[in-house]
């Protein structure tokens, strides 16, 4: 459907219930990687079914390790089945981008989030937060690229920052 929002999650209810995976498939290749990520969570939940309801759900870092592992399995399978050098190069660039986003970008999100909480407690405005975010973006990318000014508002597009405080630390 045109205009459909992307998004996905996996919900492991209890040890004896097959996990639910929700994925809004928009027809983009990225959706396949998202599915691999969520299926990583699902497989992890299924492998934990011998646990009781109190120990079934893992900590966020462990859960995200399983989901990123799902992405790596997909990447390995795509690389092994592809013969075109240019497609393989594209796959490698996407893998590097994903690895950077999974590790470094998440660390910068957490850094911003910690600073933002302190700033809000001191009465900071959204403009103050945007300026701080932009400073961290420029620090993150250094001289490797010029960060357009409108990216100061990117933090508002990251639901984890305001809907699930400190979720990004798990990566």
Stretches found by the model and what they are:
Residues 1-171:
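Cation-handling catalytic/transport regions enriched in His/Asp/Glu
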